[in-house]
């Protein structure tokens, strides 16, 4: 059984790519057709590639891999933080600071500063300092927390990265490439897939699509580390019945029929 059924992908709008004038020709192999000036992603391929990504992430997690989730666009911020945390991993969901990976030692000094400020806030140090100084220190703490809070406890450089919209996260992609860190990513029709090790062709702008796929990558990590029985039950709620229903329906329908059926609800 597929990790995510065709029905679930359709309901989340995973199949909607970008306008045809904003495409990367290298994504042609993942595009099914064009509708009203918008590319439609071939979900039959997406289903298989999600399975491949899930198995890859699960296998890496079983080896104890450190995984960094990256998604700084508004549609991804909440899902990236929530799912990385649920999987016991790390995340960057606001601006990517240049050198986060390639200048790791310097980033560590900023993380130490963040931890120091947190300690000052809890041990009473702020209570004895002038209000103006405390205000400045709190602003510094908030800024560091915003950009580095998700990697504050990351023990080392990541072994794998999961990225939502690698086109937007170009700096992160290039840093990972320099350090030979494998990338699993949601890749839309306007993105170069050659930069990604494990491609998931997908709409990367819809909140539901981002949450659906990000949650499955988190599930893979949980399963790889703890065993299938330990995966949070809520993540699989209704999945088996939906998948069975979805597979049965899609077995008798072409991709074009499916696109036509849902197009009215998603446009």
Swiss-Prot record:
Question: Organism classification, top ranks?
Answer: Bacteria, Bacillati, Bacillota, Bacilli, Lactobacillales
Q: Does the keyword Ribonucleoprotein apply?
A: yes
Tell me the segments the record calls region Disordered: 224-267
Protein name from the UniProt record: Small ribosomal subunit protein uS2
Which InterPro entries does its entry note?
Answer: Ribosomal_uS2, Ribosomal_uS2_bac/mit/plastid, Ribosomal_uS2_CS, Ribosomal_uS2_flav_dom_sf
One biological process GO term for this chain? translation
Query: Among its keywords, does the record have Membrane?
Result: no
Bias class Basic and acidic residues marks the residues at: 225-251
| A Pfam family | Ribosomal_S2
Named from the GO MF annotations, one term is: structural constituent of ribosome
What is the organism field in this record? Levilactobacillus brevis (strain ATCC 367 / BCRC 12310 / CIP 105137 / JCM 1170 / LMG 11437 / NCIMB 947 / NCTC 947) (Lactobacillus brevis)
């Amino acid at each position: 059984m597929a990790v995510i059924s065709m029905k679930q992908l359709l309901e989340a709008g995973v199949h909607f790519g970008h306008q045809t004038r904003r495409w990367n020709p290298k994504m042609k192999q993942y595009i099914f057709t064009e509708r009203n000036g918008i590319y439609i992603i071939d979900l039959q391929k997406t289903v298989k590639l999600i399975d491949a990504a899930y198995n890859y992430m699960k296998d890496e997690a079983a080896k104890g891999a450190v995984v960094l989730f990256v998604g700084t666009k508004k549609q991804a911020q909440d899902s990236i933080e929530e799912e990385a945390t649920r999987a016991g991993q790390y995340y960057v969901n606001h601006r990517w600071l240049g050198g986060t990976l390639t200048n790791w030692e310097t980033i560590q000094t900023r993380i130490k500063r963040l931890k120091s400020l947190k300690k000052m806030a809890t041990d009473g140090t702020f209570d004895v300092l002038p209000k103006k100084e405390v205000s400045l220190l709190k602003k510094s703490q908030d800024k560091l927390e915003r950009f580095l809070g998700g990697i504050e406890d990351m023990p080392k450089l990541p072994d794998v990265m999961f990225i939502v919209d690698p086109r937007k996260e170009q700096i992160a992609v290039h840093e990972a490439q320099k350090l030979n860190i494998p990338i699993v990513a949601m890749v839309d029709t306007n993105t170069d897939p050659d930069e990604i090790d494990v491609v998931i062709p997908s709409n990367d702008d819809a909140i539901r699509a981002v949450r659906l796929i990000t949650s499955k990558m988190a599930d893979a990590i949980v399963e790889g580390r703890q065993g299938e029985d330990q995966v949070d039950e809520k993540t699989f709620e209704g999945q088996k019945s939906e998948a069975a229903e979805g597979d049965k329906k899609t077995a008798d329908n072409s991709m074009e029929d499916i696109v036509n059926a849902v197009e009215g609800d998603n446009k």
